[in-house]
Amino acid sequence: FSEKPEIIDSTLMIIPDNHLISFSDNIPSVIPIEGFVSKRMEGVFSKVDNLHGGIDIVAKEGSPIKSTSAGVVVFSGWTYEMGNLIIIYHGDDYLTHYGHNQQNIVSRLDMVKKGDVIGLVGNTGISSGPHLHFEIWKGGKSIDPMIYFPEFLKKDLTLKK
């Protein structure tokens, strides 16, 4: 995702004591949406010009999107490329991105729990049909979500090279 909104400032890293996120809560472990993977992540060593920094999960438009772990919403808004986009900070340098949403249900600085519904699957921004574009970031680097959710390997519709 090339169009990065300025989302990190000192106020976003302050989490109230009564909303502390435990280590086990911040690791993505809840599937964000039931569906099929139509496009996989293309890493930095890919020979493709337009890298794909996450996975696309095809699902019925309007289906609920769940937070993969507890955290604070640091961005909930519109970008040209991702359309309606939600970015959640989970602590321990984890961020998750949920793009092309029909509707964002959460707002900036909302606290979410693992499994909370945060948005609805859509077809906004630069999109070829209803799906969720899902990314995991750790320490400023994009990580393949298939590592965290190997069950998607059984639902992978992408062409093998």
What is each of the regions a protein language model found here?
Residues F1-V44, T158-K161:
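Polar/charged, compositionally biased leader and regulatory segments
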Residues V30-K161:
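Catalytic cores of peptidoglycan-degrading enzymes
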